[in-house]
């Protein structure tokens, strides 16, 4: 069992100055989190000297592992030249052209600093382009922390949203409509019944923050069809899946091209970044070309963009996705064997380098995930931490693999699962 005495002391100090003792709610492990001292490869070390095999990987960005030497050198080289100018740089052109070459949905793009900014700006652009107000999101789909998308999942097929946080007036979310994932009939009905004022559909092609939950059959192609037929802008939020499922993200993996795409996490090489892009006629609405305003002091941050160029270059040159797919398949097969041997009513979900053990039946949507044993998973999380394996502390978060995870790491991890799954 790990001891966390120094982490507890830090948490006691932190909660006096930081709400909940953390800078983001997902880090608020109960009764207190471990505090990280360093990380390298697939290992993360806390201030008490405990070392863990890491399957959070900063919740997705570190597909090449922590402290990748190529990315590290790119950051150092840029820091020597300065790290914030307030002027355009050639780095933005280099990374922008590379992204556009990999994502057919992107003719033009803009760099921002976070995934939240990317989805917020994409929705604003879609509304400005269509001169319409309403949009559809998927129940349980996560698109950052801006007001319009912080909406509770409804119990029916579709609901007019109510805010999922205090401080958001209901008027801010009255144009946010929800449907269940993998329910094309509900999607079609809500689009067609609101067609006169329907601007966009925003969705994670693979639900990452309650999963991963995968599209069934031709669901994504059917969503593409109904949005095209009704002149609705389709936005794929690929902040998680971009550069993770394939170089061209989920849209390459599943063969579906949206009108707009948002990116983040991996494309910044582990530094803060966001991207929104799409068809030229939509992006030309963005200021200063058009009348949809968007701006940011740190947009196109040279250090972040330099790290992103390095990360994308390594991913492309080393053709990592085939290896990651094989690693993911190996791990998921091992987990399925353990669950079968123990005769547990659990489901192993995942795709490529994303995976999760659901403490319940196979989920197709948000309502299914809510039926999973959340308390059982929480106990399992702590048991795995005591076995020096760091998983997301919530049943609702995806586990990630990196190129730094070795076969020996997977074997150690499966041994821990075999002991702790019950």
From Swiss-Prot:
Q: Which CDD domains match?
A: OAT_like (cd00610)
Q: Which InterPro entries match?
A: 4pyrrol_synth_GluAld_NH2Trfase, Aminotrans_3, Aminotrans_3_PPA_site, PyrdxlP-dep_Trfase, PyrdxlP-dep_Trfase_major, PyrdxlP-dep_Trfase_small
Give the location in the cell. Cytoplasm
Which keywords annotate this record?
A: Cytoplasm, Isomerase, Porphyrin biosynthesis, Pyridoxal phosphate
Q: Which Gene3D superfamilies match?
A: Aspartate Aminotransferase, domain 1 (3.90.1150.10), Type I PLP-dependent aspartate aminotransferase-like (Major domain) (3.40.640.10)
Q: Which domain of life is it from?
A: Archaea
Gene Ontology cellular-component annotations: cytoplasm
As recorded in UniProt, its EC number(s) are 5.4.3.8
Q: Which cofactor does it need?
A: pyridoxal 5'-phosphate
Specify whether Isomerase is a keyword of the entry. yes
Q: Which family does it belong to?
A: Belongs to the class-III pyridoxal-phosphate-dependent aminotransferase family. HemL subfamily.
What is the official name of this protein in its record? Glutamate-1-semialdehyde 2,1-aminomutase
User: Which species expresses this protein natively?
Assistant: Methanococcoides burtonii (strain DSM 6242 / NBRC 107633 / OCM 468 / ACE-M)
